[in-house]
């Protein structure tokens, strides 16, 4: 039964053998008690409604997925033991119970005002994705390293001053968000995440990246903007699959020569740093290079065939000869 975004204000009647109910993005404020008796129900989608409470759903033994993002729930729902997907992003639950469905594979608890989570959460060994973003967490315990099947982890927008070395024990392949925290450093063990594709460390207090970052061979996109980096490790040039590197808003004065080895790099954002010079060679495949608001007085004699080069607010001595061809193609922004 599907009726998303239909302007419903009340839960409609459904067949007793219904397997899917999708009532997302309506104006429903209450779920009737009889829903707890829908023995065949496998998936219930109630995202974006006005729910403040739910009946006890623990008896729905067929239920595998429960979507409740964007409601007003003040307490954690009572769920069946075989539940695999639970999305509660953007509610007001405040606390997580000690007992959770042990078979959970996807769990979203972001934006709920959580200050801590129970130890039982870190024992959900079937988890593949975990979203704890936009809470008020101050620590992540070492036992997180036991979530061996985890592919996606979002800890962004919390109050973490550190993360445990055991993060490197995870099997993350898709993404790791640690943005908008209070991190002054990340552990060297992070380099063991050699299959991770996307790493976001933006808006922290990082003064350095670990040398081990060069071992993260699977990285396709790395975002470290809004930190306090003064230099980059030479090992960064070993990231053979990297396509986007976002370093804006740091304190970089120079780049390592090894950056030329990033053969797959297409986007390099270096605006709002303190660069005085660039390496003699830049990645040959680079297409977008943003150098706004640095302290450059000159450019290397050869540049890659860029589609866009932004050089505004630098201190260039005249217009370097190397820009002529790019200017003719309309690829350069100087002022």
Language-model regions, residue ranges each:
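Consensus "Asn ladder" position of solenoid repeat domains
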Residues: 6, 26, 49, 68-71, ...
């Amino acid at each position: 039964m599907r009726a998303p975004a239909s302007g419903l204000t009340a839960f409609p009647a459904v067949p007793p053998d219904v397997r899917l109910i999708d009532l997302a993005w309506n104006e429903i404020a209450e779920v009737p008690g009889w829903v707890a008796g829908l023995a065949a129900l496998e998936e219930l989608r109630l995202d974006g409604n006005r729910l403040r409470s739910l009946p006890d759903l623990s008896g729905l033994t067929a239920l595998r997925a429960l979507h409740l993002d964007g409601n007003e729930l003040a307490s954690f729902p009572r769920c069946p033991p075989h539940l695999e997907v639970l999305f509660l992003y953007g509610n007001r639950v405040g606390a997580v119970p000690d007992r959770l469905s042990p078979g959970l594979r996807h769990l979203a608890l972001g934006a709920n005002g959580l200050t801590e989570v129970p130890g039982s959460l870190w024992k959900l060994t079937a988890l593949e994705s975990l979203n704890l973003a936009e809470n008020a967490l101050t620590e992540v315990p070492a036992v997180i390293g036991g979530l061996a099947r985890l592919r996606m982890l979002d800890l962004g927008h919390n109050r973490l001053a550190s993360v445990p070395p055991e993060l490197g024990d995870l099997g993350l392949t898709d993404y790791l968000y640690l943005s908008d925290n209070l991190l002054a450093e990340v552990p060297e063990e992070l380099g063991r995440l050699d299959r991770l594709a996307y790493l976001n460390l933006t808006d922290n207090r990082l003064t350095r990246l670990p040398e081990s970052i060069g071992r993260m061979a699977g990285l396709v996109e790395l975002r470290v903007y809004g930190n306090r980096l003064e230099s980059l490790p030479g090992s960064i040039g070993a990231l053979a699959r990297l396509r986007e590197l976002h370093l804006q808003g740091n304190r970089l004065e120079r780049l390592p020569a090894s950056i030329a080895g990033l053969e797959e790099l297409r986007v390099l954002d270096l605006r709002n740093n303190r660069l005085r010079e660039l390496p003699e060679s830049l990645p040959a495949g680079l297409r977008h290079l943003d150098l706004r608001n640095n302290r450059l007085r000159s450019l290397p004699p050869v540049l890659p065939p860029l589609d866009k080069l932004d050089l505004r607010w630098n201190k260039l001595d005249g217009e370097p000869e190397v820009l002529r061809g790019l200017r003719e193609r309309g690829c350069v922004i100087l002022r």
